[in-house]
UniProtKB/Swiss-Prot annotation:
GO terms for cellular component: cytosol. Catalyzes the decarboxylation of four acetate groups of uroporphyrinogen-III to yield coproporphyrinogen-III. It comes from Campylobacter concisus (strain 13826). It catalyses: uroporphyrinogen III + 4 H(+) = coproporphyrinogen III + 4 CO2. This is Uroporphyrinogen decarboxylase. GO terms for molecular function: uroporphyrinogen decarboxylase activity. Pfam families: URO-D. Keywords: Cytoplasm, Decarboxylase, Lyase, Porphyrin biosynthesis. Its EC number is 4.1.1.37. The keyword Lyase applies.
Length: 340
């Protein structure tokens, strides 16, 4: 698998490429399956349909890896929190996690068992995915998941979380520890079900200043990485802490690949982290609106990363209104221009 070879710094015939959110709303085929499922969570829980949309970008675009179709918040959902997706406002937890009784009510054991639909999606996808294509599993980072659980949904300033961080840091650590233990078991079950690599998404890493991030954020990512690597040393682990270009000097851990978001100059990431880690990224997603912009973005990143271990990706998820033709063009151009 070219993607796995790249994760492990082995030579590849070209730079492998995939896109975050590649199974998504820009594809008419995805929208057709989602309409049949009824809503987003129903699609996540229907393993046959979830597998179908996981495979679509491989079949339609020719990406080098499929990424499991699911959501980072299925873990707190199956731990016992009430989650719904509201049109226009995203995920909402009807009873945010604010006290020890609510934390005690959440069950790690229940979550691992109740997420069987995810493992079934993985098994079915791996059966139908070409042998040379990797399947990436994933989870959210503990900090990012905790922000949703505590705030009750998305947030502009994370005021409730930060108040807790400064007023009751021990309780925030208790939440993060419990979420981390659930995620460790979840990722290990994904690997047993057949994923070839895993990615940890820390979408809201930039909400914390440097010292707080390494105490309440990255340290918990490394707990997951250490536990996974102890049991599955050959499974590549990708970390994607978004928006922390100022903290790169402090990044270390047993992971294999560091995902670079589009706001971080890839030259800076290369200087600080390569060749210790394979870099993944980091084209600005809106470049996909224009083939000329795609050409410029691809050329610049390939030129910067020439000779260094690299996986091509966007610096964040593909947007819902990107023309499919442009997404195809992007994938093909990366594969063509990076051919050794």
């Amino acid at each position: 698998m070219i993607f796995i070879d790249a994760c492990l710094k082995k030579p590849t015939p070209y730079t492998p490429v995939w896109m975050m959110r590649q199974a998504g709303r820009y594809l008419p085929e995805y929208m057709a399956v989602r309409a049949k499922a009824g809503d987003f969570l129903s699609l996540c829980k229907d393993y046959k349909k979830a597998s179908e949309v996981t495979l679509q970008p491989v079949e339609i675009l020719g990406v080098d890896a499929a990424i499991l179709f699911s959501d980072i918040l299925v873990v707190p959902l199956e731990m016992g929190m009430d989650l719904r997706f509201e049109k226009g406002e995203g995920p909402v937890f009807t009873k945010p996690l604010r006290d020890e009784a609510a934390l005690d009510a959440l069950s790690i054991e229940r979550s691992v068992k109740s997420l069987a639909y995810v493992y079934d999606t993985i098994k079915l996808t791996r059966e139908n995915l070409a042998k040379d294509k990797a399947l990436i599993g994933f989870c959210g980072a503990p900090w990012t998941i905790a922000t949703y659980m505590i705030e009750g949904g998305g947030s502009k300033n994370y005021a409730v979380c930060k108040k807790m961080l400064y007023e009751n840091p021990e309780f925030l650590h208790q939440i993060l520890e419990k979420v981390t233990q659930a995620l460790i078991l979840y990722i290990k079950e994904q690997i047993k079900a057949g994923v070839n690599a895993v990615q940890i998404f820390d979408s809201w890493a930039a909400a914390l200043e440097e010292q707080a991030y390494f105490e309440f954020g990255f340290s918990y990512i490394n707990k997951i990485v250490d536990s996974v690597k102890a049991e599955f040393p050959d499974i590549p682990v990708i970390v994607f802490p978004k928006g922390i270009s100022g903290y790169l000097d402090k990044i270390s851990g047993k992971f294999d690949v560091f995902g670079v978001d589009w706001s971080t100059p890839i030259e800076l990431a290369k200087e600080k982290l390569s060749p210790r880690y394979v870099l993944q990224g980091n084209m600005e997603p809106t470049r996909l609106y224009s083939k000329k912009a795609i050409d410029e973005g691809v050329d610049k990143i390939l030129s910067t990363m020439r000779g260094a271990p690299h996986i091509f990706n966007l610096g964040h998820g593909i947007l819902p209104d990107v023309p499919v033709e442009n997404a195809k063009y992007f994938i093909k151009e990366v594969q063509r221009k990076s051919a050794r």
